[in-house]
Amino acid sequence: MDASNPIVHPIGDHHAVDLEEGPLIVTMKELPGMPGTIGGLALRVGQFLFAAAAIVIMVTGDEFTNYTAFCYLVAAMSLQFLWSFMLAILDTYALLIKRGLRNSVLLSLFVVGDWVTATLSLAAACSTAGVTVLFDNDLNYCGQMHCHRYQLSAAMAFLSWLLIGMSSLLTFWLWASE
């Protein structure tokens, strides 16, 4: 549904006289977190900052190239960084020219791109966390490796995935309501 009844969700100071003329319909065009809003920009900035942190933390480890899960995390977070940075620039541009990003073709591109990057990010974060738990709890390699660094990188990847998941759901909601 694309509208809200002011009796249920009052906006401003409406008198009973206004309601006798017929129901007032208030459109919900800009919900927080939608593309082209301040909330959407904040989500995108958080996504690319956490992705960048995951990359930097992982790459500064000595032996990350020896393990496929760690290399996959760097690749997935690089894609996440590029996607979120590009959309943050687009959100900034939309805010500067005061135009919304409600084109259905554009929204469908955002939804599919968010789903792909969210899936890759979650897979990378889970595989990195799994390998790190294996090294720490089962193989006792953490005395020889930088396990805490890898755990922190996985945590940053999970935070980036959480933000892109929120952004993906909000964009899908907007796209489905068009």
From Swiss-Prot:
The keyword Transmembrane applies. Residues 59-69, 126-154 are extracellular. Glycans are attached at residue 66. Residues 1-37, 91-104, 176-178 are cytoplasmic. It is found in: Cell membrane. GO terms for cellular component: plasma membrane. It comes from the Eukaryota. Its main location: membrane. It is a multi-pass membrane protein. Pfam families: CASP_dom. Homodimer and heterodimers. Belongs to the Casparian strip membrane proteins (CASP) family. This is CASP-like protein 5B1. The lineage of its organism: Eukaryota, Viridiplantae, Streptophyta, Embryophyta, Tracheophyta.
